[in-house]
């Protein structure tokens, strides 16, 4: 289907959502403590979010932050007036608009939900075939364009898009288009087919579940309209050919009809831009080629542009108004910015439901598509199959031939970013994907009923919005807001209309999201549900649509596990029951807040259980007060409901099927600690077990960094103090230590240093410091603090920076050879090719009417058009982050593969979200052991790095056919290369039982410096791309320097000792699963160490 750019799970980071919620809970707790000590809101201060929270807590208006915009000089009295204004606004709207006899709720989305409800278990007893039929029907209604489905779902939009008194889209395009191919496409359409295509595209782009996106780029909309029309044309031609073939046979089909007129998914808009770029290429120098090119609107508009013009002429969309930047001195406009975004002028709630939903039938296995190219012939990836050639998941994906079916690879640019697999060695990948997507779930009815019953209370504490907001009509609501604000003259001098408009629309959008989330839950109440799996080019798994564990806290609380159809009979003895209860209680406590050790979490939840039993009002009052400072309020509510149900019924299944969430402790730094074999990093990321006098506790790498930063600054200030004593006339500088201690904390340190892992530059670091210290320090102080932080990183994390530089330099070198950057795991190979993107500004003209007169308007469409040249700089700066993410992904796949090999694998549910793992309480204790072993299964760090060098330097050098290379390598060197190539096939170093033998083995896999130099010289002789010799030699020298420094450390006596410590900590020693002669697997119980383990934790 057309890519859901606003709701595909790759667009959101669930970890970031959790972090924001945790910080919100922490700040709310701080405000509650301030209230305890009697801290008041100032009478006139620059209002911020915490001030709004404080005012809300003081006045029992816990949802104030949703309705009061931050910023400006506003008092507590002003906030109170605005809060009353909103109450009046909602009441007025409900009385004057919603009670109007002409008002109707948008009903068109109910078609999808009613289909599910009508076939639910409480009305019929579905067979497998019936469930398959229901699933196929839902997919046809929500995922793909079917004209009849869209037409029937138009509802209140029918009069807007289909009006017999107005020109149809087909007639409009026939008037505007000039290209014969485009005209043929339009003529093949039905009377209202183009209108239905437009509605379908708008439904995909303007999505009620996209809380963070209200506008769509003009270029995106034009491109999607163009592509959708051509995909439908291809389908029409294919169907026509099938009919002719069935009636007349192959010989009677016209030869011209055997070739589709338009390539699948290719739009005229992008093609015209490329044509214009090619035309101008000769007149643009290499230097200016990277600057934005302004391209005038071409004379022959494409289908997408013409449909955009039709929408604008019907006043269904509008382009956002330009932004004028004013010169503060002259008070005149100095620049105009054209945003290039478009808004709908009708309620997007009225659009048909076009979003992927959970499945009620098990997803189809991923299979190599028969028409796909099975093998690729590239020396780097010989005999491997691209993941983009696999079809499966949704049932209809195997039935569609029009090119719009999703593939296993979630990337849009196949070939540019792809995964290639060996169909034999990569079986664990496909098996893990099958395990993940065949796991059944169901809706938590207890939580669903609780939320519906207590909706108004949840609104009052700021967790939900009023239900009626979702029914507000945009046009009527904004008209009422304007008139009501006009009546409140005093309020209109404090708050701008644009501010309040933004607040209102955000709340309407959020309310719509919540309402339809509950509608989805209601529709699936009586079904088992499944989530198809998709992988990105690094191997990380995703799900599509708005309802799965990648989503927000509300959605997560509504999903629980269900038994697989092939699950073995399961007996819960007393030990298993104790384990379920123990793990569930810890998980429940962590939904409330973080704890240093699990023991503290248990103490907290035991006290909470006493409250449940002793306070009759707990579920009517106390629990909602608790949610004010919760990390995950809805999941906390879910846990409390489950505990209450278990206490009443003694039914352990209530706890057993509730998911528990465990996150890897700073997984990127865990993987880095493994590559560096750094004991400190390993301990402070909880990857290595270490006890102290107080017992084991959860360590935090960012707290560790925070402490190290303070120590570094203390040492620096001592030096500066000594310098001051020697130079008494020197101007006193602001104390960096005092400033950082007063403003920084653990969360700020994380914000500063986590992106360092992914190539954050000193410039970006300085911008972050500027944002943090805005109004609290001058530019000199900001520069000084930024300099100290940057120096601290380079000094204290030098080895980490060296490894990052090594990966980046090799990537630069590989991309400079006009080859994809390749990085591997034992199961798959990732191909990454960043292309230069031309910044293009195109002019699009469209007609509209004003005062019954036609008016021609022009808007700008800003695009980034990929060119054919590799972007070497982007490859260099981006590869390390992708490299680490790939190792994360391998760890997740390896962990699921381990579970697949257990004899009771079908009974062990698992859901992976990047470096987060979800399972039943019964099996939560085994995941840390599996996670550690999965990291170890990546192989020895030096072998992984060597493989990266072989892919980009040594293999290309060996394969170089230049005559001068004939005797470049000696017999011994070629023999060494052959042996190393064999070593790369098995990245694990065997346990020799001797430190000396292990050390000799590690030293034997170090690539000699002389051999590297020969390979580099060989590659320079084969180069055709013009890269300066100076730059090339500089990159070569850096690679060799950093690699030799890395190998000297890893292969040293200390390095070997560190490797053995990591091996002893990570490898699952008593491991019959990995034996080649083992067929029965091992019991999951043997993996439970019976102790708290925090490498992944709640």
Swiss-Prot record:
| UniProt keyword terms in alphabetical order | DNA-directed RNA polymerase, Mitochondrion, Nucleotidyltransferase, Plasmid, Transcription, Transferase
**What does the entry give for GO biological process?**
mitochondrial transcription
GO molecular function (one): DNA-directed RNA polymerase activity
Q: Say if the entry is tagged with keyword Flavoprotein.
A: no
One Pfam family in the UniProt entry: RNA_pol
Which class of enzymes does this protein belong to? transferase
**Stretches the record annotates as Disordered:** 1-26
Q: Where in the cell is it found?
A: Mitochondrion
Which GO cellular component terms, listed alphabetically, does the Swiss-Prot or TrEMBL entry include? mitochondrial DNA-directed RNA polymerase complex; plastid
Protein name in the entry: Probable DNA-directed RNA polymerase
**PROSITE patterns listed in its UniProt record:** RNA_POL_PHAGE_1, RNA_POL_PHAGE_2
Give the function comment from the record.
DNA-dependent RNA polymerase catalyzes the transcription of DNA into RNA using the four ribonucleoside triphosphates as substrates.
EC number(s) from the headed UniProt entry: 2.7.7.6
**InterPro entries found in the cross-reference section:** DNA-dir_Rpol_C_phage-type, DNA-dir_Rpol_phage-type, DNA/RNA_pol_sf
Further information:
These complexes consist of double-stranded linear DNAs with proteins covalently attached to the 5'-termini.
Active site residues per record: 663, 750, 915
Does the record's keyword annotation contain Cytoplasm?
A: no
For this UniProt entry, what is the primary localization, expressed as one broad class? mitochondrion
Q: What is the similarity comment for this entry?
A: Belongs to the phage and mitochondrial RNA polymerase family.
Q: List the catalytic activities from the record.
A: RNA(n) + a ribonucleoside 5'-triphosphate = RNA(n+1) + diphosphate
Regions of biased composition (Basic and acidic residues) lie at 1-24
Domain of life of the source: Eukaryota
Native source organism of the sequence? Zea mays
């Amino acid at each position: 289907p057309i890519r859901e750019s606003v709701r595909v799970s790759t667009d959101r980071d669930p970890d970031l959502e959790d972090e924001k919620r945790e910080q919100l809970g922490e700040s709310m707790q701080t405000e509650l403590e301030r209230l305890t000590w009697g801290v008041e809101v100032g009478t006139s201060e620059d209002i911020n979010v915490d001030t709004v929270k404080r005012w809300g807590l003081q006045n029992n208006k816990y949802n104030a932050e949703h309705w009061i915009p931050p910023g400006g000089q506003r008092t507590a009295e002003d906030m109170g007036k605005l809060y009353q204004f909103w109450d009046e606004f909602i009441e007025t709207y409900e009385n004057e608009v919603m009670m109007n006899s002409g008002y109707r709720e948008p009903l068109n989305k109910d078609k999808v939900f009613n289909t599910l409800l009508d076939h639910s278990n409480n009305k019929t007893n579905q067979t497998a075939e019936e469930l398959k039929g229901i699933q196929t029907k839902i997919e046809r209604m929500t995922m793909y364009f079917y004209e009849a489905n869209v037409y029937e779902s138009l509802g209140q939009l029918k009069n807007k898009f289909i009006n017999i008194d107005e020109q149809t889209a087909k007639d409009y395009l026939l008037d505007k288009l000039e290209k014969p191919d485009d005209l043929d496409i339009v003529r093949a359409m039905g009377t209202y087919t183009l209108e239905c295509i437009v509605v379908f595209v708008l439904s995909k782009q303007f999505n009620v579940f996209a809380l963070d996106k209200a506008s769509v780029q003009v270029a995106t909309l034009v491109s999607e309209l163009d592509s959708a029309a051509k995909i439908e044309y291809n389908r029409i031609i294919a169907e026509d050919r099938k009919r002719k073939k069935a009636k007349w046979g192959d010989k009677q089909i016209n030869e011209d009809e055997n070739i589709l007129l338009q390539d699948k998914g290719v739009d005229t808009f992008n093609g015209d831009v490329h044509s214009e770029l090619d035309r101008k290429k000769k007149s643009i120098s290499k230097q200016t080629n990277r600057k934005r090119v302004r391209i005038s609107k071409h004379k022959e508009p494409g289908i997408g542009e013409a449909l955009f013009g039709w929408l604008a002429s019907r006043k269904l969309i509008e382009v956002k108004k330009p932004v004028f930047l004013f010169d503060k001195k002259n008070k005149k406009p100095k620049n105009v910015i054209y945003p290039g975004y478009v808004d709908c002028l009708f309620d997007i709630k009225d659009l048909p439901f076009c979003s992927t939903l959970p499945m009620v039938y098990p997803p189809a296995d991923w299979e190599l598509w028969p028409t796909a190219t099975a093998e690729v012939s590239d020396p780097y990836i010989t005999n491997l199959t691209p993941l983009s050639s696999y079809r499966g998941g949704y049932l209809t994906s195997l039935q569609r031939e029009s090119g719009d079916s999703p593939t296993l690879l979630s990337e849009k640019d196949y070939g540019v970013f792809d995964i290639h697999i060996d169909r034999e060695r990569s079986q664990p990948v496909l098996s893990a994907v099958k395990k993940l997507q065949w796991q059944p779930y169901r809706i938590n009815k207890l939580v669903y009923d609780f939320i519906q019953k207590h909706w108004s209370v949840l609104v009052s504490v700021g967790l939900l919005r009023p239900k009626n907001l979702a029914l507000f009509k945009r046009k009527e609501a904004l008209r009422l807001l304007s008139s009501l604000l006009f009546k409140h003259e005093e309020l209109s001098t404090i708050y701008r209309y644009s501010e309040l408009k933004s607040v209102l629309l955000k709340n309407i959008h959020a309310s719509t999201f919540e309402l339809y989330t509950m509608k989805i839950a209601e529709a699936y109440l009586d079904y088992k549900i499944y989530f198809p799996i998709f992988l990105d080019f690094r191997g990380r798994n995703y799900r599509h649509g708005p309802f799965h564990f990648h989503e927000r806290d509300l959605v997560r609380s509504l999903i629980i596990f269900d038994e697989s159809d092939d699950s073995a009979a399961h007996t819960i003895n007393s030990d298993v029951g104790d384990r379920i209860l123990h793990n569930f209680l810890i998980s429940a406590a962590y939904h409330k807040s973080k704890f240093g050790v699990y023991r503290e979490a248990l103490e907290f939840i035991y006290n909470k259980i006493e409250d449940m039993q002793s306070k009759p009002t707990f579920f009517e009052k106390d629990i909602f007060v608790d949610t004010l400072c919760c990390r995950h309020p809805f999941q906390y509510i879910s846990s409390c409901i489950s505990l209450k149900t278990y206490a009443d019924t003694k039914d352990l299944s209530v706890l057993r099927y509730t998911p528990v969430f465990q996150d890897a402790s700073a997984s990127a730094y865990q993987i880095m600690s493994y590559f560096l074999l750094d004991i400190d990093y390993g301990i402070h990321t909880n990857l290595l077990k270490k006890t102290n006098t107080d017992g084991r506790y959860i360590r935090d790498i960012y707290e560790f960094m925070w402490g190290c930063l303070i120590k570094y600054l203390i040492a620096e200030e001592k030096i500066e103090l000594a310098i001051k004593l020697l130079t008494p006339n020197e101007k006193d500088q602001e104390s960096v230590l005092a400033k950082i201690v007063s403003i920084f904390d653990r969360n700020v340190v994380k914000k500063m240093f986590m992106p360092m892992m992914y190539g954050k530059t000193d410039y970006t670091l300085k911008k972050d410091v500027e944002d943090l210290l805005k109004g609290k320090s001058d530019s000199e102080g900001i520069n000084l603090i930024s300099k100290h932080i940057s120096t601290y990183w380079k000094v204290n994390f030098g080895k980490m920076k060296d490894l990052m530089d090594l990966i980046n330099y090799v990537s630069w070198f590989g991309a400079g050879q006009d080859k994809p950057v390749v990085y591997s795991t034992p199961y798959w190979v990732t191909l990454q090719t960043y292309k230069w993107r031309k910044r293009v500004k195109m002019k699009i003209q469209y007609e509209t009417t004003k005062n019954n007169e036609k008016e021609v308007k022009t808007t700008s469409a800003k695009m980034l058009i990929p060119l054919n040249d590799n972007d070497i700089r982007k490859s260099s700066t981006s590869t390390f982050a992708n490299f680490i993410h790939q190792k994360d992904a391998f760890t997740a796949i390896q962990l699921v593969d381990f579970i697949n090999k257990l004899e009771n694998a079908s009974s062990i549910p698992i859901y992976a979200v990047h470096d987060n793992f979800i399972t039943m309480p019964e099996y939560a204790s085994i995941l840390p052991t599996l996670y550690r072993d999965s990291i170890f299964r990546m192989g020895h760090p030096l072998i992984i790095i060597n493989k990266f060098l072989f892919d980009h330097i040594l293999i290309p050098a060996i394969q170089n056919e230049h005559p001068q290379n004939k005797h470049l390598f000696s017999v011994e060197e070629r023999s060494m290369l052959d042996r190393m190539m064999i070593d790369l096939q098995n990245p694990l170093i065997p346990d020799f039982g001797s430190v000396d033998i292990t050390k000799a083995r590690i030293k034997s896999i170090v690539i000699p410096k002389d051999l590297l130099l020969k390979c580099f010289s060989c590659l320079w002789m084969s180069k055709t791309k013009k890269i300066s010799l100076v730059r090339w030699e500089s990159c070569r020298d850096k690679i060799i320097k950093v690699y030799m420094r890395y190998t000297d450390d890893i292969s040293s006596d200390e390095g070997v000792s560190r490797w053995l410590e990591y091996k002893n900590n990570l490898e699952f020693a008593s491991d019959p699963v990995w034996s080649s002669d083992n067929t029965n697997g091992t019991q999951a119980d043997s993996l439970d160490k019976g102790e708290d383990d925090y490498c992944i934790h709640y």
